[in-house]
Amino acid sequence: MKLEDFDFELPEDRIAQHPVEPRDSSRLMVMNRWTGEIEHRVFRELPELLQAGDVLVVNNTRVIPARLIGEKEGTQAKIECLLLTRRDKDVWETLIKPGKRLKAGQTVVFGDGLLRGELLEILPDGNRLVRFNYQGIFEEVLDQLGNMPLPPYITEQLQDKERYQTIYAKESGSAAAPTAGLHFTPELLERLQDKGVEIVEILLHVGLGTFRPVKVENVEEHTMHSEYYRVTPDAAERINRAKSQGRRVIAVGTTASRTLESVAGENGRIEGKEGWTDIYIYPGYTFKILDGLITNFHFPKSTLVMLVSALAGRDQILKAYQIAIAEGYRFYSFGDAMMIL
């Protein structure tokens, strides 16, 4: 398969620059992946579209304000540091700009010395390992000094940091939001549970590799970034019970779907465990757990478009995207949603 097989023309005015209010007023395209039939709904109507017994699997990661601006120690040279992945208690894999300004052993000072970062190592892919020194609790220091790492295609300033968090976000560690979850409100979750829909939480800390362009012509040759996940034994048991009873398991977002497929055995059961996954899902992949997916509209030639194409078929997805563009759906992180069943 060629990379251009997943390309399409997206007008710039279809890229959502800010979220809609309230969260569940976003539009929802519903696709039957077996027939290709498409329905246009609103996200708050989700309880009408699901059945009692369905399981929604959500990713409860929390985005950290991962973009830090500091100065190289002893100079006034500005350094931008983007936290990507925690590798140890105080050691992070980061993206440093401009990278040439900082050599191993040198230090960046943030917030008048409230936080200091020492460059330990330059990794083969150009990312940097940095050890941080600080007083108090790292997350609190980060909240004080850091900015939300909004995707590069969002050029408007975010007024409310919480708007780039899901309402069920718990454990800090992501460099980007699991954006399919941004459409949920507390009231909508309550209505879903009243309907008999089961909500199961799992964790995957989203890395910025999500936004990295695929640079190979043959999609099979692409290598995915690695991300930390955790599925508790209780979550695994609830999902396995649903599968054994013939109930549908629907992932909220590509991160939840990748986590589920990472812990799935050939027997169609999952086990509770934690670790790192670099699972890469593209057409030809056979899903072991997923019966459906709620996701946003993704950018051309991305691994995310490949994943939804693996579930619903490339031709059907590209056709649905053309309809979405013509109908004025909003794309990307703050955009509208699609449910594939």
From Swiss-Prot:
Keyword Mitochondrion carried by entry: no
Catalysed reactions, semicolon-separated: 7-aminomethyl-7-carbaguanosine(34) in tRNA + S-adenosyl-L-methionine = epoxyqueuosine(34) in tRNA + adenine + L-methionine + 2 H(+)
One Pfam family linked to the record: Queuosine_synth
GO BP terms, alphabetized: queuosine biosynthetic process; tRNA wobble guanine modification
Record flagged with keyword Iron: no
E.C. code: 2.4.99.17
Location within or outside the cell: Cytoplasm
Pathway(s) annotated for this protein in UniProt: tRNA modification; tRNA-queuosine biosynthesis
GO molecular function: S-adenosylmethionine:tRNA ribosyltransferase-isomerase activity
Enzyme class: transferase
Entry GO terms, CC: cytoplasm
Superkingdom field: Bacteria
Family membership: Belongs to the QueA family.
Quaternary structure (record): Monomer.
Its biological purpose: Transfers and isomerizes the ribose moiety from AdoMet to the 7-aminomethyl group of 7-deazaguanine (preQ1-tRNA) to give epoxyqueuosine (oQ-tRNA).
Name of the protein described by the UniProt record: S-adenosylmethionine:tRNA ribosyltransferase-isomerase
Taxonomic path: Bacteria, Bacillati, Bacillota, Clostridia, Eubacteriales
Gene this protein is translated from: queA
